[in-house]
C-alpha cells in the first residue's frame, strides 16, 4: 500500500505519472498523497506491474529502471523481493506491520535482517528485538531447524554483496502440492 499512512477511503483516488516523471497517488482533490520521489529530470516515464508483482517505474528513451516497489516493501513479502541490510550505511529494507486490522498505517512491529555481525532475521517491537531466527548457517537460520522441511521456508538465501549489504531473498518459487 503506497499511501498507508494517508489511505484513501473512497474510490476517488488515482495513481498516475506526474509532470516530473514520478509515480504518484492522488486523492479526489488532486492532492499528492504519495510519490516515488526520484529525480528523473524529464517526463518520459512508464509504469509496469511485472509478472512477479513488482511495480516498476522506468524513465528515458532506454527505459532505465528508476524505482521499484520491491525496494520499498510494506507489510507483505513476495517471492523475488529482497530484504537487505548494510551495517556500514545503516540502510535496510524492512517489512512493517499494520497498526491494527482496520488501520493500515505503520504499526509497532517490523521485520528484516539485523545489520550487525552474522546476518539474522529479526522481528522488532517498537525498535526492540522481539524474536530472532538465529544466525544464517549457509543453508538455513540455525534457530529455525524446520526450514528444511517446511514448504513455506524452503529456498531462502542470504548473500553478502560487495558493498557489505546482506540480502535475504527467496531464490526459488515455492511449489505447494496437495497430497
Task: Go through each PLM region and give its residues.
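Beta-rich ligand-binding surfaces for carbohydrates and other polyanions
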Residues: 1-179
Amino acid at each position: 500500500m503506497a499511501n498507508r499512512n494517508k489511505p484513501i477511503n473512497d474510490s476517488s483516488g488515482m495513481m498516475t505519472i506526474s509532470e516530473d516523471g514520478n509515480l504518484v497517488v492522488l486523492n479526489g482533490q488532486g492532492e499528492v498523497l504519495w510519490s516515488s520521489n526520484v529525480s528523473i529530470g524529464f517526463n518520459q516515464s512508464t509504469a509496469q506491474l511485472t509478472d512477479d508483482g513488482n511495480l516498476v517505474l522506468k524513465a528515458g528513451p532506454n527505459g532505465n529502471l528508476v524505482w521499484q516497489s520491491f525496494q520499498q516493501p510494506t507489510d507483505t513479502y513476495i517471492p523475488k523481493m529482497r530484504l537487505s541490510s548494510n551495517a556500514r550505511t545503516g540502510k535496510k529494507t524492512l517489512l512493517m506491520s499494520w497498526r491494527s486490522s482496520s488501520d493500515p498505517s505503520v504499526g509497532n512491529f517490523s521485520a528484516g535482517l539485523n545489520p550487525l555481525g552474522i546476518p539474522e532475521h529479526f522481528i522488532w517491537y517498537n525498535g526492540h528485538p522481539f524474536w530472532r531466527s538465529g544466525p544464517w548457517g549457509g543453508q538455513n537460520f540455525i534457530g529455525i531447524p524446520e526450514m528444511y522441511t517446511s514448504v513455506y521456508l524452503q529456498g531462502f538465501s542470504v548473500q553478502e554483496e560487495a558493498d557489505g549489504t546482506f540480502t535475504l531473498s527467496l531464490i526459488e518459487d515455492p511449489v505447494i502440492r496437495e497430497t
